Design a protein with these regions (language model features):
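Intrinsically disordered, low-complexity acidic/polar tracts
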Residues: 10-82
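Short cysteine-rich clusters marking metal-coordination/redox-active sites
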Residues: 13-16, 98-101, 127-130
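N-terminal export/targeting and maturation segments
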Residues: 2-8
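Acidic, proline/glycine-rich low-complexity IDRs
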Residues: 122-138
Length: 138
């Protein structure tokens, strides 16, 4: 299967009865535009990166991008909404995923508290089942 140059997939919330989206996960090949035509310049900072991954829609007012060193594997996991596979590649890529529950949840079902600390902002809290969670990019 050929991996697309740019991919945008909604990961559903897996809380019982919830119809919301946990997050939007996007993958683009090095130097390409996202589906919304925005340019990510991480490939200029990380010349070895094959592409970029962007997460949005999980935390309010927050999205983040990071380098992808294996576009084929990352794209394959995103195409089938496999948050566990993405977590295995890099745990920070799927802040909406609880590895203990093996489920993704939207922001409404997480009990997260923001901490704003002079450039070291983060969220901490628990998933719906009470498993501890820490998000260091916000």
């Amino acid at each position: 299967m050929e991996d697309p140059v740019r991919l945008r997939v909604a990961f559903p919330c897996q809380h019982e009865g919830c119809q919301r989206i946990a997050a939007i996960v996007e993958v683009i090949r090095r130097g390409q535009l996202y589906v919304d035509e925005e340019q990510d310049v991480l490939y200029r900072i990380f010349p070895e990166a094959q592409g970029t991954l962007r997460i949005s829609g999980f935390l309010p007012y927050t999205s983040f991008s990071t380098q992808v060193n294996n576009v084929a594997a990352t794209t394959g996991a995103v195409q089938v909404t496999d948050a566990a596979a993405l977590h295995a590649m890099d745990r920070t890529w799927v802040p909406f995923y609880c590895r203990h529950c093996d489920r993704s949840f939207c922001g409404e079902h997480w009990n997260l508290e923001p901490t704003f600390d002079w450039g070291f902002d983060f969220y901490s809290g628990t998933c719906p089942a009470g498993h501890a969670h820490f998000i260091d990019h916000c």
